[in-house]
């Protein structure tokens, strides 16, 4: 059960990070030195897919289950735990198969299973969301995160199709890559982290003011903000205007969030100095990110 094996998951996740780092070092080694045993492109695919599925996604899923575990019965918790192990299995399957064959039958099969797993996880979460009343503000962020996780898979499907059919053209290839990356980074990762932060605030009985408005601004603006990654594609002026509006909307949403968080000054007395440092660090990082957009 997840509540009794948190230390195990932490060790697994850290080991997965170690593998990601080793693959990254190997790719850089091959740039400067002869190392014929592995294909650079295949290692790159293995590195990126394992980093996303085996490290970041695994971490977020474990943390989300950790938040909701106290509200689950034994059967429900067992289902989530099984999904975590299946995701881990898929991640290692992708790691090995991408190194050996690149985009092929087995790597695509493991990728497909990992996508199906996220869909199943999302369905379970949505069904049981009413149980997590203490973290009612965090739930909407988790829901948004899972929706974007599924949505980002469209980019993976498009990439797999182009790789298998050898029908590679620069514009659709890059558009698919950026589609996947945008809805992973700015969708799945960002909203899951926001859910974890909001859940922490709820735990200390701190409610985020205008939470629904902030969520709505950031969620709906995330979709057209994808085109910020495709400005090189010579977008029509009407779409460019929408993209600019989306960037401004995200900035406004972030400012409202910061205003609400720092309004609750008593939060500081309930958090350690390390936690407060992380909160300020994230606040500044997010401000810089949305300002640059």
Named regions from a protein language model:
Residues 1-293:
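Hydrophobic alpha-helical transmembrane segments of multi-pass integral membrane proteins
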């Amino acid at each position: 059960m997840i509540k009794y094996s948190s230390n195990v998951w932490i060790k697994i996740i850290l080991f997965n990070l170690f593998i990601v780092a080793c693959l990254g070092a190997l790719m850089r080694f091959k740039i400067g030195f002869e190392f014929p045993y592995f294909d650079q492109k295949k290692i790159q695919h293995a590195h990126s897919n394992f980093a996303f599925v085996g490290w970041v996604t695994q971490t977020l899923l474990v943390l989300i289950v950790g938040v909701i575990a106290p509200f689950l019965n034994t059967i429900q918790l067992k289902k989530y735990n099984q999904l975590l192990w299946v995701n881990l299995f898929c991640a290692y399957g992708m790691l090995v198969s991408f190194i050996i064959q690149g985009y092929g039958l087995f790597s695509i099969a493991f990728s497909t299973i990992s996508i199906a797993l996220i869909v199943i996880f999302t369905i379970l979460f949505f069904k049981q969301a009413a149980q997590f009343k203490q973290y009612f503000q965090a739930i909407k962020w988790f829901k948004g995160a899972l929706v974007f996780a599924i949505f980002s898979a469209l980019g993976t499907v498009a990439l797999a199709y182009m790789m298998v059919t050898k029908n590679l053209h620069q514009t659709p290839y890059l558009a698919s890559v950026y589609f996947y990356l945008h809805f992973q980074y700015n969708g799945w990762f960002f909203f899951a982290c926001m859910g974890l932060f909001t859940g922490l605030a709820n735990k200390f009985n701190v409610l985020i003011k205008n939470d629904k408005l902030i969520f709505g601004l950031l969620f709906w603006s995330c979709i057209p903000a994808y085109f910020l990654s495709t400005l090189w594609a010579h977008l029509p002026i009407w779409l460019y205007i929408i993209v600019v509006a989306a960037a401004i909307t995200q900035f406004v949403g972030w400012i409202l969030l910061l205003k609400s968080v720092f309004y609750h000054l008593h939060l500081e007395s309930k958090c350690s100095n390390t936690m407060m440092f992380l909160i300020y660090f994230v606040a500044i990082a997010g401000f810089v990110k949305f300002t640059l957009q």
